[in-house]
A protein has these predicted regions:
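C-terminal His-loop and adjacent cap/lid subdomain of alpha/beta-hydrolase
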Residues: 1-128
């Protein structure tokens, strides 16, 4: 646990920079509940204006395709250039990815039925 509490780790939800999290709904290494827990920490720290999350229909860990990766880069560049988030809903992200002619279709989806009712982990970053 000390590893996650070390300075420089951004697991407490107190981000100081814009952050787009991409998460695959079937990620076997980082369950959906952990993303919800991080979102809860972001909100508790009043940092919701700096944070967005995009879910991808995939059962891998960091197996984003080239279209999804390009969408993430473009979304962050737009956020950094303009100071505000553009649309980050699945339909908008999929349309952006399709417009890039990457040779593969982006797979952004709503988190829907994969949402857990509440963050259900005993340990939270910054606590002992």
């Amino acid at each position: 646990l000390a590893f996650w509490d070390a300075p420089g780790r951004n697991v407490t939800g107190n981000t100081r920079i814009p952050l787009l999290r991409m998460h695959e709904i079937g990620d076997y290494q980082v369950p959906m509940g952990l993303t919800q827990g991080y979102t809860q920490l972001i909100e508790e720290n009043g940092k919701g204006d700096l944070y967005r999350i995009a879910y991808v229909e995939s059962a891998t860990h960091c197996g984003f395709n080239v279209a999804e990766s390009a969408v993430a880069i473009e979304t962050m560049m737009r956020r950094l250039d303009t100071g505000s988030w553009g649309p980050v809903d699945p339909a908008s992200l999929n349309a952006l990815g399709a417009s890039m002619d990457a040779g593969v279709a982006p797979r952004f989806i709503d988190n829907g039925p994969w949402t857990v009712k509440e963050y259900n982990r005993i340990w939270r970053p910054g606590t002992r």
